[in-house]
Amino acid sequence: SVTSVLEESLNGARGLLYFESTNNSTGTAEIVVTFEPGTDPDLAQVDVQNRLKKAEARMPQAVLTQGLQVEQTSAGFLLIYALSYKEGAQRSDTTALGDYAARNINNELRRLPGVGKLQFFSSEAAMRVWIDPQKLVGFGLSIDDVSNAIRGQNVQVPAGAFGSAPGSSAQELTATLAVKGTLDDPQEFGQVVLRANQDGSLVRLADVARLELGKESYNISSRLNGTPTVGGAIQLSPGANAIQTATLVKQRLAELSAFFPEDMQYSVPYDTSRFVDVAIEKVIHTLIEAMVLVFLVMFLFLQNVRYTLIPSIVVPVCLLGTLMVMYLLGFSVNMMTMFGMVLAIGILVDDAIVVVENVERIMAEEGISPAEATVKAMKQVSGAIVGITLVLSAVFLPLAFMAGSVGVIYQQFSVSLAVSILFSGFLALTFTPALCATLLKPIPEGHHEKRGFFGAFNRGFARVTERYSLLNSKLVARAGRFMLVYAGLVAMLGYFYLRLPEAFVPAEDLGYMVVDVQLPPGASRVRTDATGEELERFLKSREAVASVFLISGFSFSGQGDNAALAFPTFKDWSERGAEQSAAAEIAALNEHFALPDDGTVMAVSPPPINGLGNSGGFALRLMDRSGVGREALLQARDTLLGEIQTNPKFLYAMMEGLAEAPQLRLLIDREKARALGVSFETISGTLSAAFGSEVINDFTNAGRQQRVVIQAEQGNRMTPESVLELYVPNAAGNLVPLSAFVSVKWEEGPVQLVRYNGYPSIRIVGDAAPGFSTGEAMAEMERLAAQLPAGIGYEWTGLSYQEKVSAGQATSLFALAILVVFLLLVALYESWSIPLSVMLIVPIGAIGAVLAVMVSGMSNDVYFKVGLITIIGLSAKNAILIVEFAKELWEQGHSLRDAAIEAARLRFRPIIMTSMAFILGVIPLALASGAGAASQRAIGTGVIGGMLSATFLGVLFVPICFVWLLSLLRSKPAPIEQAASAGE
């Protein structure tokens, strides 16, 4: 009832994507509100707080007393710190650990920039009053008497002062009155007087209760590698930098450790930033490898260190300029910006290679000076460079305007790549010609006829070029027939693309896994701990596992005695082979616990993008959209999960949450209670204090205000009979047993109620079986969910929601990229036919990318789409190099066919050189291993496949498309005089 009121107030919040509320049987509730990426978190928090403020008028007083807390934080844990005793320490009780962490560590970490929330897996100390109900009855006392006595005798006393104004003018001294009203330790609390008897004897608290300095809450405990510990999980604030925040947290922990007691130590057993650190380091290595390979390709073709040096100088200058712009835009060095840099290496050298190769060719053919050759070369290639630069930078612009989380992924990649390409084009028109004119030396005619390895290479390449030119002349002569082949390739592209399995991002080996432990409903903590110990023993036997942090009483599904969550962290990627990958370890654990002795133990891969869900795979919310009731919703859940169990497309699927559990229903005869003079408020207060716990007030412990908590002693709350043995006071002050007006019965009931976007719902999570993508599993899930009874609906959430958004945007993304490139070429060439002949080559590159990904068993994910957009630009680039020259030759009076064949021959060498440089620059991505390897391979494989087809098929089809299209449209060249004046 409370959360439904709050949910109503949240509807209409600006930037709201979805919200989910979780109501627990313990009386707590949480609403997680998710906003669109890019929403200002501070404004969103203020908006939510204002909406909740308006709803407070409809809140019960108990809720207002406890208060509503609003926090802004990202989902998922960034890291977990653990505080434990050193080996050989005298102490072993975790109460002191939890209290020390609460006093000296947690708040220090909460204050750090980037920390949104700290989830503490323990509690600070409290004065625990363990009541013996039987002793209370023996003294004729009730739990209310205990509560009232503590409240009355543990108080702050502001006694005032003597001699203070107004007073006598002769008063010369004032002083405050100090009265010790608060109690400080178990001995003092034990002296609290519950009753004074007529004979002068006293009944004290110590007579009916055991007092100790214990934990405020015993609901959650944790272990590190089997050793009791306390820990805290850090969650990022929205928009915070994970690496920076993790570094600050670890630095602060190191500083605080200097003040730890001698027998305490800390560790960070779980750290998601480690993957990002290592992955970025791997990409930097890939960047260096790409530069070396590109240098070797350039040296192979240019065969002179000076020639090779020029593009090698241009690349760092471009990257430096790109980093400067990224800094000004507030971008960070992350996986996507680094991917952009790696792809840029091969693209950046293109413009410089085109200039240098043309200068070198002119000097070799005509024997003129470097300065003269540079001037002549720039007249020939300036138009092509401008076209290539504009096309390659423009093709990435649509990526920057994508919505959702995928837009965030695309934005930094596209902007960093587009900026670097613009710098490359600018330098190719200014800096590169200057370097050519000053660094290059004159070379004699016939330079390519030298002896040795390079001479053999040049002669071999010349023969290939001549054969290519001969083949081109034959193909162009039959352009119409080969356009039918082209149409077949386009049809093949559409066929294979539609059969690519859909996914959002590839599953990564993040260096850890998540293990969810769920025992049967109603299972005790003892049973949960036993299963946890069995899990720890298994993980200890695995060579790949470095450490295990286990939390009992807590899971992403909810809190309860039958729940636990483990975070096994693996050794470094360099120390593990393929047989010890995260996927292999997850499979081994799930196989070992396939038939557990007690409950279920399920290992899942973490989400590849931290903050989008608790695990990889898919996440669905089954919803009661028509008020059919909880029973119908549960039946739909069982039907759906039953269908999935026998479906080969699913590895697993399960309900994420706490299942229905045994409940002891107390049937209170209110008429009897009223007749006996017992109020319902007294009944509820006694029950919650005895079987739950009740916070009475605070006491001062070592300078910190901590709570006084009362609860029945453990042995007096273990059985159903102990409920009926409780006594409550009536209006006359006499004790009445609950059994006089209460009966009990067993039933099953929910311990957790979940609502999604205001509808009763059930969380269902799962993953695709090997050989199937998450997109295929989600499509199958939608098919099965559509067969459920009327009134039952579903919605995707987390990573799955973003995957659906991404899939819906793909078509418009590609169409917009092609349209932008086409319109740019139309404006550049002031023609419709020439841009069309360039754009016809795009499918030729795309088919190579699709086939490469399909043969590799990969999916149509975000990284593949990034690669495909890149191929659109690069395919157009190769076509522009040929079409630009063909257009000039055609305008000079050559026939359409001769112009196309000659342009293809002249541009064959730079196209092969630039394409090979790009392909070799991307090979380290396609062959990546270790942290981030899946993402690198996903982007590298498609790009290499696309570039191979765009190069080796493209050089054949560009002349064909050019001749066929211009012949079909009967275009005429511009007059020679006009072309000449345009050249001037």
Predicted regions and their residues:
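Extracytoplasmic/periplasmic
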Residues: 1-58, 62-65, 95-123, 144, ...
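Hydrophobic transmembrane alpha-helices and their membrane-interface caps
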Residues: 265, 292-301, 305-361, 401, ...
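Helix-loop junctions and hydrophobic alpha-helical segments within the transmembrane domains
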Residues: 269, 276, 280, 284, ...
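Signature of alpha-helical transmembrane segments and their immediate interfacial
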Residues: 381, 452-504, 905
